Amino acid sequence: CSSDLEDYDHLVDLGHTAQGDHVIMNKYVYDADVAVLIGHTQGNPYGGYSGGYKHCATGISHWRSISAHHVPQVMHRQDFVPVSTNSEMRHKFDQQGMRMEEKMGKKFFCCDAVLDTKSRQIEIHSGWAREMQPVSWKTADKRTYVHWAEKKYDIIVFGMPTNFHYGNGMGTNPIQMMQALSAQVIRHRRIMSDHCVFIVSSICDGYFHDERWPYLREL
């Protein structure tokens, strides 16, 4: 989140969504003549694709709003799978973003770049977040899932990088490593045999990047 969550002079309480989520947002954005969200559309290990209403639901909201979706009762649901556009978590992003639009009296103008495996821009979409999201997902879906493959495989060899997504140390932290692998299982499930095995190449040197995640060793 990019807001100071204790600076209540610069936060606006927008009440609750129809689903009961408390929405509090950044007052600078609320008061702006034009509200612009700039980011990317890329498959996340959780919560579906990045971009769209996910920007505002996590980036300019309050911890009370974030606690409606980044919690076990949402992230441990059966519909909680990586790179999904239809889950409770994704729906909460949309609901909170639309609540912000309703109370601001204006729509978010969203500009998202669809990224490839090396985070290069392969397509850019701009417009109202509600209409732009599904358009960007079409190309992101082609990049993320292996639509062209037909054969099923017994073995998948995967190189686990040390530095990805949130920062250095993710590929050597066992919790985040398992999360990254689960995302690959979802991506490739269609071409995996019933007894498929992942062979993962990783440094496995115990590096947790304690400066960034001081709590993960205990966790």
Question: What are the roles of these predicted feature ranges?
Answer:
Residues 11-14, 46-51, 121-126, 168-170, ...:
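Short acidic, glycine/serine/threonine-rich loops at helix termini
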Residues 13-25, 90-93:
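Active-site glycine-rich loop that binds ribose-phosphate moieties when present
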Residues 21-32, 44-48, 95-101, 143-148, ...:
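A generic local secondary-structure boundary/capping motif
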Residues 31-120:
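Internal metal/ion-chelating core segments
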Residues 36-38, 154-159, 199:
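Structural motif
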Residues 82-167:
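Membrane-embedded hairpin module used as a gating/binding unit in multi-pass transport
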Residues 169-171, 175-219:
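C-terminal catalytic subdomain
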